Amino acid sequence: MESKACESKNEDLLPSGITSKGGSSSPFFVTSTHGTIIENTSSTGTLTQMPFFPKYEVELDSPRKSTPYPGKEHIERVLEEYSHQVKDLQRRLNESNELHEKQKFYLRQSVIDLQTKLQEMQMERDAMADIRRRESQSQEESRNQLQNTVRELEAAKCLKEDMLKDSSTQIEQLRKMMLSHEGVLQEIRSILVDFEEASGKKICEHDSMSTMHFRSLGSAISKILRELDTEISFLKGRIFPVEDQLETLKSESQNKIELLLQQHQDRIEQLISEHEVEITGLTEKASSARSQANSVQSQLEIIQEQARNQNSMYMRQLSDLESTVSQLRSELRESKRMYEDKIEELEKQLVLANSELTEARTERDQFSQESGNLDDQLQKLLADLHKREKELSLEKEQNKRLWDRDTGNSITIDHLRRELDDRNMEVQRLEALLKAMKSECQGQMERQMAAIQGKNESLEKVSSLTAQLESTKEMLRKVVEELTAKKMNLESSERTVSDLTASLQEKERAIEATNAEITKLRSRVDLKLQELQHLKNEGDHLRNVQTECEALKLQMAEKDKVIEILRQQIENMTQLVGQHGRTAGAMQVEKAQLEKEINDRKLELQEFKILKDKKDAKIRELEARVSDLELEKVKLVNAGSERLRAVKDIRHERDQLLNEVKTSRTELNHLSEDYEVLKRNFRNKSEEMESTTNRLKMQLKSAQSELEQTRNTLKTMEGSDGHAMKVAMGMQKQITAKRGQIDALQSKVQFLEEAVTSANKERHFLKEEKSKLSQELSTVATEKNKMAGELEVLRSQERRLKEKVANMEVALDKFAECQDIIQRQEQESVRLKLQHTLDVKELQGPGYTSNSSVKPRLLQPASVTRSHSNIPSSQSTTSFLSHHSIKTNTPKEDPTRDLKQLLQELRTVINEEPAMALSKTEEDGRTPSLGALEDRVRDCITESSLRAELCHRSNNSLRESTEGSKSSETLSREPVPLHPGDLEDPSSCFTFTSTASPSGKMSASRSFSSSPKKSPVHSLLTSSAEESVNSTPQYRSTKPIHSPTSAKDSQSPSLETTGKTCQKLQNRLESLQTLVEDLQLKNQAMSSMIRNQEKRIQKVKDQEKMLLK
């Protein structure tokens, strides 16, 4: 019962003495404290140098209470003091550990806070850099877009100018073509008139050819062709009997040819017989070649037997050769290199032999018709070569096997060496263990010399250890025996390797001998091939002789045929002379008819040439149109390529996103693998710690058993009174020894406990990391799902963009068509303008006469010029005959605004065209659109400024008209080409309005206003450039010579036609303007959609970057 109580007390003291509340994780600190306590067991003054008594000392003192002996109370007091000091030390240690842990916790929190702040600052810096980069990219993109638009507008202007120039050239070509067609038709009519005069027949019964219309020429030509066909059929009827005569002559010539062929066959048979005699001689030569081949075969068999004998000798000599492993390796490497080179040479020789054999085969096939017996010999040679190749392949396989064996032996040698090294390391480790065990045994023997019973136990332990030593010695002996056996195996393997190298060398020699024999055989084969070539040459010579004979025979036959044909021709000529004398008159008539047919056919050819020229002109026009369409196609392709580039960029971004997703997946896989590795390491560590704890527990149990034995011995020793002090002293010595052991065990236990706590912390940390990784996996999975959804959205958007791109391409095609229509309409309007101005000039030509007596009564303005600050007032008073080269630079705007301006200018020009009337009657016939235009112009300009300018101009014009009446000049009617620059500014177009006097009898006076630019009408009404530069500008006020009724009758139809065309053009232009506006709206919608998509893509990219960060 007392022992149990002591044990319970000691167990209560253990946790207080060993473990602390805080539990510091540093084993170094614990060991240092233990060192200080053990060293200073005698001093009791300071706290840090007090002795440390474990529970075993208390348990040893517990049985002493029952048996009093001198010095017992002193020991108990000392023990109590020691226990109080230990408790105080434990409290202070716990407090210091708690303070240390708090400081660590605060430091960790501060470090974490600083890291978070650093991350936030880095995020902000990256965001600012991204924003700046995006702004710079957006600015560069906007600049590039503006530059592209400017370039496209310049290209469009250049294309319009080129189109106008091409249209003017095409118009001139068409005029020339019309003139040439008219000349051709006149020539056809003259040819038909000549045909009527020559034949005396009338093609048309009612009308003559000179008065016939061009449309009826086709029917007349068809009649002539029908008549010619009837005449040709009549001539063909006469040709048939002549063909019958020719057939009879052909049959006779065929009979003669058959006779000649029979003679030729007889000669060929003779030549064949001679050729067979020559073939028999060649067969004899072939038989001799076969005998030589048999002799070669026998020699090859002898060589094979020699090679076998040599191989047997080599196998016998393999057991006698020995060498070291290092020499073996070097020799093997060198032999391998040499052998590979030789094998390559042999393979090359085999390839050459195969190529030569294939050539021999082809030559044999060609010569098989003449010498078929040589095939057997060549086949035998080929069989021999195949046998040699098989033997070489077998030798190669044997060499490979030997090499594999050598490599295997070298590998086994390396493994054995490694095992030897491992065993040596184990032996060294066992020796170190033996030394450690010996040292431990010696220490135990020295400690237990005082105790008699302890000596017996130590002897038992020594005996067990000696048994273990003997067992380890036996293991070492076995290992040494195994090593010796392995060394023997290594030596035997080295010998076999040396034998194999010797055999390889011998085989190489045999291969060299076989190669020499093969070269000899090749030389013989070459000789045989030379003989075959000689025979072939002889055969070719015979064939050439045969071909020459056949050619001579054919020449003879042809000459015979020619002689017979000449004879037949002479006979036929004699017969035909009489017939030709009869049919000479008929032939002359036919000749005349044929000449007529030839002339007709010539005319048809000329017509066909004319049609061909027309088609060529059409083809040229179509080619010009095709070139224009190609230019437009290039523009559309460029636009489409830009759109495709944008789509490709989007795809590239999508691929980048997919690559990033893949990288994230790979990172997750790597993290999962690292997590598994950490799990495995933790399991291994936990198992090791468990094993160490089990060992320490076993040691504690053994120590406890030893303590129980010492207690029993103490109980037995208490009976003896005289020897009590001696036993006590001995026991104290034993106790001091045991205390050292117990202290060591306690330090180990504390170290293990600290390791367990650290392992638990690591386990907790790993659990936290696992939870973090699981959270990160969940977040990555959610992000992956989001990215998949966003990718699907992007794909749908790409599909929509593709559809929109297709729609935009269709719209661009329509826009190009609209541009074509606008250009055509402009060309038509310009053409109508030119026609109208030409008609007006023709009507005005005789009416312009200089008259200085007549003065205008009323002056009204018709058009207002744009005032320019740089132009002086003297230039504003010049008349419509002066030429000005000043042009204003219009700013570059959008293509839609340019189109609108062009449309407005065309409307003004079309509305101003009817204002070119010269009399009151022409004013009465104007359309209401002219009055509206005049009202607008008059409302826009103040009357005072206009009257002053007009008065000044009228005075100047009257002075100049008086001077210019002496030298009147004629107006030039040369048309001036219209440039697109003349239509850009509406103020550049001149308008001419005439107002009647109140009485209606006086002629209308005219006021002309000049502008910095020339209008097309102005350029048409003015004289040539040289006259305009040399002569002074004059203003002419004239009276019309013709009556008003005649003027009205002559100009009313032209005004009506121009009015109708102008209305049509206005309607078309309005429809085109609406189309252009619709297209502009669609383009704006598309641009807005594209911008929105770009913004979404940028948002997605920003989100991805944030997630990655």
From Swiss-Prot:
Coiled-coil region: 71-166, 242-828, 1053-1109
KW Flavoprotein (keyword) present: no
Origin: domain of life: Eukaryota
Biased composition (Low complexity): 999-1019
Residue stretches of biased makeup (Polar residues): 17-31, 862-882, 953-970, 988-998, 1020-1037, 1043-1061
UniProt-listed InterPro entries: CCDC158
Bias type Basic and acidic residues, positions: 1-12
Disulphide linkage map: none
Coiled coil in keyword set: yes
Renumbered residue ranges of the record's region Disordered: 1-31, 843-897, 952-1061
Keywords: Coiled coil
Listed name of the protein: Coiled-coil domain-containing protein 158
Species, as recorded: Mus musculus (Mouse)
Lineage: Eukaryota, Metazoa, Chordata, Craniata, Vertebrata
Name of the coding gene: Ccdc158
